[in-house]
Amino acid sequence: FDVICVMRERTRFDEDLLRQLPTLKLLVTGGMRNAALDLKAAAALGIQVCGTDSYKHAAPELTWALIMAATRNLVVEANALRAGKWQQGLGGDLHGKTLGILGLGSIGQRVARFGQVFGMRVIAWSENLTAERAAEVDVTYVSKQELCAQADVLSVHLVLSERSRGMVDAQA
């Protein structure tokens, strides 16, 4: 192959695999970051790697579905229905609660909008976020400690790296 388009982030292209593709000139990935690609090996082998503008709706939609499922006890309720029981409980409300967002980039901003639509107070923190930038999307900037202390729901939207690994722990 001269060109390969990688559609899944989990498809590994390590040095061994890249060496088995001697005619490969271009490796295209959905999104701008793909940890499964060995960029150093690709460069050493003369393979150009580039990304596309990612589809930014899937992650926020899945995030919101998981928040709703956890808050409303969806799995327990679905299992009760399957067992012939009806509505064991309503779960908790989101309206009036605080949504904390760690990482207010494009995905975090979309999740913030979902929270706002549901009547949640939305707060955020990340290392490069400013109060002014947060205010542009009607979000309140807080410290990391305030974020963890005040959030009823904490949603993390950071690239996993050495800098972000372990950022949320028991001390947070």
Q: For each predicted feature, which ranges?
A:
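N-terminal glycine-/charge-rich "phosphate-binding" loop or analogous flexible N-terminal tail
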Residues: 1-8, 119, 132
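Phosphate/diphosphate ligand-binding glycine-rich loop within oxidoreductases
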Residues: 3-78, 92
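Alpha-helix boundary recognition
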Residues: 18-22, 43, 82, 95, ...
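Residue-level detector of alpha-helix initiation sites
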Residues: 33-36, 54, 85, 98, ...
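Residue-level detector of flexible, active-site-proximal loop/helix-junction positions
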Residues: 34, 56, 81, 129, ...
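A short, charged, Gly/Pro-tolerant segment at domain boundaries
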Residues: 80-88
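Rossmann-like dinucleotide/phosphate-binding beta-alpha-beta segment
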Residues: 89-172
